[in-house]
Structure formats: C-alpha cells, structure tokens
Amino acid sequence: MYQNVYFDGRSIHLWDDKLGYRKTPYKRYAYLYDKGGKFTALDGTRLKKVFRYDKEDENLYESDVIATTRTLVDQYTDSDEPSVGHRTMIFDIEVEVTEGFPSPSKAENKITAIALWDSVTDEYYCYILDPENKLEIESENRVLKKGNNTIIGFKSEIEMLNAFLGKYCEIRPTIITGWNTDNFDIPYLYNRVYQLLGQEFAGLLSPIGVVKYSEYRQRFEIAGVSSLDYLALYKKFTPSLKPSYRLDAVGEDEVGIKKVSYEGTLNELYENDRKKFVAYNLNDVHIVVELDKKLDYIETSRGICHIGHVSYEDIYASSRYLEGAILVYCKKIDVVVPNKNKDARKLMAQRAREDKFAGAYVQEPQKGRHEWVFDLDITSMYPSVIRSLNISPETKIGKVVGWDSKEFIKKDNKKTYTIEVGGKDKGKLTESELKEYFEKTNVSISSNGILYRMDKVGLIPAILGKWSDDRVQFRKLAKQFNDDGNEKKFQYFNRRQYLQKILLNSLYGVLGLPVFRFYDIDNAEATTLTGQELIKFSKKITNHYYNKELGTDEDYVIYIDTDSIFASATPLVKARHKGIDTNAEVIMTQHILNIANEIQNYLNQSYDLFAKRFLNLDKHYFEIKQEVIAKSSLFITKKRYGMKIINEDGRKVNKTLVKGLDTVRSSFAKGMKTLLSEVLEDLLANVPKEQIDKRIFKFKKGMKAMDYDDIASPTGVKRLGKFIKNVDERNFQVMDKNIGGKLITTYYMKASPVHVKASLAYNDMIEYYGKKKYPKIVGGEKIKWVYLKQNPLSLAVLAYKGNEDPPEILQYIKEYIDVDKLYNQALKKKIKMFYDAMGYGLPVDERYTLQRFF
C-alpha cells in the first residue's frame, strides 16, 4: 500500500510499503461518448477511454481527476488498508526574536534550537546553538545523553543545521508533525537552510530533493514526506471551539502537560538559563507526542485518506477523500463518473456571499426548567433519508414545482402540478393524475418535490449502505476482540468503525458543496428538507401519543434539534402512578425508560405511514432510538440548554450535558464560566433563587481580588489591519495622550470590534514602553482583553497575549482593570438569560433589601 505520492507535472513519484520508491511517467486519460464503447457512465452513456483530448471539451468524463488520486485509485483499487512501515518525526524549532515575530518567509533570525522525537526509537533530540557552552557539556563532541534525551550543543548555526539534517536523513521520516509546523516551523526551517546552506541542503528534507510551495494548499509540499500539522488536525477533529489553541492550553487540557514556564521573553530564557531553554524546547515536542498517543489523529487521518485513496495532506478537504472513495467504488463496479462543474469555484464564492441551502429544523424550546426529560434521536437521519429516497445524481428524474405533501393528501385538493425535467417545463398533472403516477411508477418524492427512480439503487445510497454495513461489521468485531482480550485487534477494528462513522456523517454535507463532483443543490435540499419533515412528523406523533392517553390537547415536545426530540415523561408517569414520589430516582428512571421505549416503538411503527403517505415509499431506513434521561433540564433558547443526565443508553451515569451555553463557550472568561456552571447546577437542582443570588453577588464582590486572567475575555483576532485609519481620514476615534514626552496614539474606525481596539492599544503600548523585543498582536492570534477604568493613557480597553507580554502592560491591566464593567457587559447579560428562562427577575443583593432586618 502507498505511503506517499507526489506529482511533479510529468511523473508520478510513489512510495510503497512493500515495493519502495518508484518513478513513472504519468499518462492522463479521460472518457468520451462512443456508441460502441466498452465503458459505461453513471447515467448509462457508453464511453471509450481516450489519452488525447481537448481539456475544454464539455463532454469529457473523469478528465479532471487529479493525477495523484487517479494513480492511487487505479493502482490500489482493491485495498483501503493503511500502509505500514511509517516513521513519524515530531519536531519544534526555536527562533531568535529581535523585533516582532519572526517571518517564516524571510527567515532572517537565527534558529537557536531544534527538538525532535523519532517514533521508531522513541528517542528525543535537541540541537542547540550554544557557542559559549552555557550548558556545560563536558564531552568533546558536546553531546549529553540523559535517558531517551540527547542534547547536542553547537558553536554555530550552520554547524547545528548540518547536524540536524544529518539526523533527519538518518531517520528519513515518512510523516512529520508538530504544533503549527505548516505555518511556521517548516517554512522557516526550509527558508533558513536555503539562505545559509543553499538549495541542495534545503532539498534534503525530501528523499528526492523536491520541496515546493503549493498554492492550492497554501504551504510547503515535501515530496515523499507527509506533513500533518497537529494543530490543524486538532482543529479538524475536535468538535467544540477551544478558548485557546496555544500548545500550552491544549496540552494542559488534553494530557495535563503545560509548557515549561519562564519569566520575561524566550530570548531572555535562552540567554540566562539555557538548560531550562532546552527543557522548554523538548517539552513542546513531548506534549505533541502525548497528544497523539491519546487522540490518535495521525492514524485516523491515514485511515480516512486510504479509504479515499488520496495523499495524507488531503485530510483537511472532506470533498477530496469522499470523492476518492466514490471513485474507487465506481471503478470496482465499472462505472465512469462525470466531470465536476467547471464553475465550481465561482459557485463557492457565490455561496459564501449568499445564504446556504436549507438546513436542519430547530424548534424554539419551551423555556425553563423541566423535570424527567428524555430524548429520541433518529439514527443517522441524513444518510437514512438519502438511502430511503434513493438520492443520487443518476436517479434524479425531475421536480414537482410547488410541492407540498400535506396539501397534496388533503381530500379537497384540486391543484394542478407542473413537472420539470432538467429545469424545463415538461407538462402539468392534476392531483388525481399525479396520484395515479405515484401508484403506477416506482418513484419517490422528497419534501422539496424532487422525483427519484427506485428501480435501481443509486450510487450515493449504495455507498452509504456499504459504509453502514461495514461499520456494523467492524463494531461487532471490535466487541468480539475486546471481549476476548485481544487489545491490538480491538484497537484496529474500533478505529475502522470510527472511520466509517466519519465517512457516513460527512457525505451528505458535501452534496451541497459546489466543488464536490456530485454537487446538486436539489439533492442537498431534498436531504435536509425531508429530514425536517421527518422530525416534525415525529413531534406530531409524540404529541398524539401523550394527548390520546391524557385526554388533552397540548404540546408535550419541549424542544427539537435537527434529528432529536425532547419531552418530559412526568405527565404520563403522574397519570399512571398517582401520588408517586417524582424524586425517587430509581423508580422514576425505570418508568421513564418504559415510556420512552413505548413512544420509540410507536414512532418507528408510524414511519411506515410517513414514508408511504409523504414520500411514496414502500420501505425505508428511518429509525428512532432513546439515548438519555435527564432528571432535570434547563432550556434557554435554540441550541442552548443544559441537562442533568442520569441514564445514557440504558447505563446509569451522573453528568451535566451542556449545549451552546457560555459555560462551555471558548469566548467567555474562565472565572465567569465557573460561576455560570455553578448557577446552572443550582438551577438544575432547583436551588431557591435567593441562594443563587447570594452566590452571584459573592462572586461579584470577589472579582476585585481575582487574577485578571480569570475574568479577561478570550477571543481570536481577525482582520486587524482592516480597522486602522490614517489620521487624516474621517470617521475615526483618537486616543492621544502625551505622557512624559512620549506619544501613544491609536486610530481606528468607530465600528471597530472591541477586541480590535484592545489589540491596537496593546501594540501601541509596546511602542510607548519601547519594548520592541516583544512581538505585537497580529491577525489570527488568540488574545484576552479587559475593560479599563480611567487611566493616564485614556485607554478604554487593553489586550494581552498570555505569553511573552511586557510586564509593564500586565501591570497596567492589574492596576486599571474595570471589574464592574466586565461584570455588567459580560456576566450580567448571561445570568439574565438564565433567569429569564426561569421567569425570574434580576438577581437581588439581600444586603440592600429590607429582608435582612427580619
């Protein structure tokens, strides 16, 4: 199986785990219509294979498959097993900072250290520029070995780079990674080596001497070596936004390892404590090593890419690996697929400007606290819709314009329907004629009126079916080997089932992506709108179940989100078991499990009716399952709620599930998140409002004594330069104070976001204090910011980075932070959302009420 693939414009360079390295001329080919051709297109057209063709010919098939994917699909059609024999190198470089953050493209500053880890030997190395021998290494060759750490000091940077390249060529990694390596370490290292040692030495990073900047990927491409930046992988596979993506924060959060702490700048650490500097460099690598041991993102990425038959760097583009997987499937069944839409890029830009296609249905919740809530989730709803309706490019027949299924089934419906095929009017049918068409023709109809033939399984449904079946099989095998105690095989099959899950949940999302080969906005909306109708139908049937038993006419569904409905079992439990103690957790849980199971079965039986009446289907894949029971829940608004879960998938648990609340949001201050979490727990536990008010005002009173870092607002900086104005332009604000003969001035537009103002103020203060050795804040960074009280520089807000900040700026924040404004602008509004949902008034400080006298 392939380890790496590279296309140089003429030849394919392929690294195979058994056959080694091969270079072969690339022969492009495509398919064209030929009445007697031996190949068949997805739409049934007969085709012939051609090696010479006009790239602009609109009748071509598969002419636009990229060379690397074409090669991998053709050579490895029968296998999607990940290759073996890989050697991963995790590395990190440290660079001297003179003025501002070092530019990777210019690479003007010295590299002071390079640390690396070799996956085969489990050895760590640190190559450090140490001309004065401050490390006090006594051996003649300046090598110090401690356990699996080897530290080597050098008198010059050129010496150090030569030695590192020697070790790199000795290791000859197939995969390299680190934290932000694509944007900093790799380009800086390559450009620095190029400047000091020349092209030949810089090319040593590649086994064939080819390192080029890829405009498509916006980073360097090293032929024969896969660069998988762990920061990028972490962002791709971690579902929730993090308050900070700094290695320090992620390391502490995920594996309990922080960066080595130091005072001042990294330059000062290098000059004053070189041993600690080495520890800092090695520790950065160690954190990434431990992250991958826990998260396994490199193997996950490789597994996905092998299923898709694409290079590992394509892991970030789901449309690439999904398309590759479909191409492999089609090749196995001897089907040729069409070219992509030539206007895909224009459509992508247009989509970015306009609203996206219809998405999921989310119902505004019945706000407030609800007891004994259970959920019911439709299993793999979108894949199930696609498979049930047979949604695929080649199965799409046409469209019923203005289709409304509820209107269609009404007895007095006299509407005439227009039928479109290929966007053209093909005639009109009365309601009775359309009914007759449905009865006599094996077609389905989606909620947006798209007609699909059902006589043959479509390409997309067939692939989803295969992936679903594969996942079921892998899960069975994983369980079997886990029960047998075979850890190695359990891990293998558990990963394989996880990969299938990723593919299943990704495919429907790219149907509405113009760059996807099988893009069709009708098919995308057929999926989402039918999903909407299905979940709304589920609500209607659930309410029917409640109202029939209780003799009422009420809405018992508290909330709907995409494929899930939430309802309280309390009304049914109380009606069936008069006088029951609803605080009796064990008894209540059993009653609720029984009720949820009843409604689950009732809904699953009703889906036959839904499929036939609304979609013209005799069979379907719709199924709903109960997952969690919450003793109490608090619903605030759409996508924002908290639940005290006591049962999950039939197992007893005790945890708080939070969705969308500021207790888990990355842009909310750490200390304030803690308070909000406590308030949420109190509300879920039905703690009296007076006690919660006490907690809130105790926190407010204590804010002045808190560390500013706990109450500062974290955020990412975007488009910083966009808001800066020249002094002679209109519509700007000026903060201008001449203090001690120095001038601090920031010009920004009135509409500037508060974090931009805070960042610009920080950058000006670096100039003001003459601290040019500290890098300024730039776009893309994560920062924290605070409001300030009246201060000598008249700054309203001020930011800081959280690492390598001038002590003068941090002291300024400590002295002038406005905790009252932070409370009022940030925390008070969030608490009000909670209290509004409960029907409470604002928190009351009992110290200022008459109640304290009684």
Model-derived features: where do they sit?
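Active-site palm subdomain of RNA-directed nucleic acid polymerases
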Residues: 259, 535-562
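DnaQ-like (DEDDh/DEDDy) 3′-5′ exonuclease domain used for proofreading
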Residues: 1-172, 283, 287-310, 315-362, ...
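Catalytic palm subdomain of template-directed nucleic-acid polymerases
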Residues: 565-598
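C-terminal, non-catalytic extensions of nucleic-acid polymerases
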Residues: 596-854
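Common nucleic-acid-contacting/processivity interface regions adjacent to the catalytic cores
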Residues: 268-406, 411, 486-541, 559, ...
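Proline-aspartate-enriched helix->loop->beta-strand connector
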Residues: 164-188
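Active-site-proximal helix-loop-helix substrate-binding element of RNase H-like nuclease domains
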Residues: 124-126, 133-138, 146-151, 172, ...
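Conserved catalytic palm subdomain of right-hand nucleotidyl-transferase polymerases, strongest
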Residues: 91, 228-229, 368-381, 468-474
